[in-house]
């Protein structure tokens, strides 16, 4: 210390101590550490966000996978129903084609034993007057137009003409009896065929109506599930946008 003497006494001067380091200003090393910490924090935040998005995507995929098997089953059921309808329509069309295009049946031989006698070929019925016999013969001919194909299919018109000739002549023999029996058997076959066709058509219409109702119900269920899936996706998208 330097001493000075003055009027008021001795004065001593305190030397200035210079600061050897700047403690207030950060160094480059501190700045690098700070930047590294910030980068690590940002990376951790990004990783957390990515993990969160991955979890959400996995959840959506799992939920979609749960809905997909149900949709596939419903589509398979709908396709099977369409195939069944197509098959039924094909069967109906084939039956109609067979009725129209099948080869004619060979007439039975006149020497074949007659089947069970009906009211037409009993002895009493054959003893009627020619007018009554003509009425009995003409009644099967007056069938509706829709049955004309069956009559032509079984070759009924020639036999009816032959029977009319026999009745007009008034002669009765084995040939006329066999002709009457053959005609009756053919008409019985026609009646059985018509009954079977009408029964099959009625049953098929009932099954088709029931299948149509099942298809409508399955379509309604499919539409409801589609709407639910769309709403679920919208809600997930809204949640993701809100978090961003």
From Swiss-Prot:
UniProt-annotated stretches for the region Disordered: 1-28, 96-131
What segments bear the compositional bias annotation Polar residues?
A: 13-28
User: Which key words are in the record?
Assistant: Coiled coil, Nucleus, Transcription, Transcription regulation
Q: Where in the cell is it found?
A: Nucleus
Stretches assigned to coiled coil: 212-239
Question: Does this entry carry the keyword Transcription?
Answer: yes
Q: Which domain of life is it from?
A: Eukaryota
- Give start-end positions of Low complexity composition bias: 96-111, 122-131
Q: Which residues form the signal peptide?
A: none
Q: Name one GO cellular component term.
A: mediator complex
Give the family this protein belongs to, as stated in its UniProt record: Belongs to the plant Mediator complex subunit 9 family.
What does this chain do? Component of the Mediator complex, a coactivator involved in the regulated transcription of nearly all RNA polymerase II-dependent genes. Mediator functions as a bridge to convey information from gene-specific regulatory proteins to the basal RNA polymerase II transcription machinery. The Mediator complex, having a compact conformation in its free form, is recruited to promoters by direct interactions with regulatory proteins and serves for the assembly of a functional pre-initiation complex with RNA polymerase II and the general transcription factors.
Q: What is this protein called?
A: Mediator of RNA polymerase II transcription subunit 9
What would be the name of the gene that encodes this protein?
MED9
């Amino acid at each position: 210390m330097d001493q000075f003497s003055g009027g008021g006494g001795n004065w001593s001067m305190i030397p200035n101590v210079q600061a050897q380091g700047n403690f207030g200003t950060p160094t480059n090393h501190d700045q690098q550490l700070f930047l590294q910490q910030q980068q690590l924090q940002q990376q951790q935040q990004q990783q957390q966000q990515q993990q969160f998005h991955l979890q959400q995507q996995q959840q959506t995929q799992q939920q979609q996978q749960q809905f997909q098997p149900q949709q596939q089953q419903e589509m398979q059921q709908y396709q099977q129903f369409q195939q069944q309808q197509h098959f039924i329509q094909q069967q109906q069309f084939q039956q109609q084609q067979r009725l129209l295009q099948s080869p004619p049946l060979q007439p039975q031989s006149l020497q074949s034993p007659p089947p069970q006698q009906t009211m037409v070929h009993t002895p009493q019925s054959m003893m009627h007057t020619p007018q009554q016999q003509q009425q009995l013969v003409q009644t099967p001919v007056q069938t509706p137009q829709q049955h004309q194909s069956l009559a032509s299919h079984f070759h009924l018109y020639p036999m009816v003409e032959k029977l009319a000739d026999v009745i007009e002549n008034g002669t009765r023999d084995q040939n006329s009896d066999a002709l009457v029996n053959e005609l009756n058997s053919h008409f019985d076959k026609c009646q059985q065929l018509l009954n079977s066709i009408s029964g099959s058509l009625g049953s098929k219409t009932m099954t088709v109506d029931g299948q149509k109702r099942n298809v409508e119900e399955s379509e309604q269920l499919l539409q409801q599930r589609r709407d639910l899936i769309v709403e679920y996706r919208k809600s997930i998208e809204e949640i993701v946008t809100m978090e961003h």
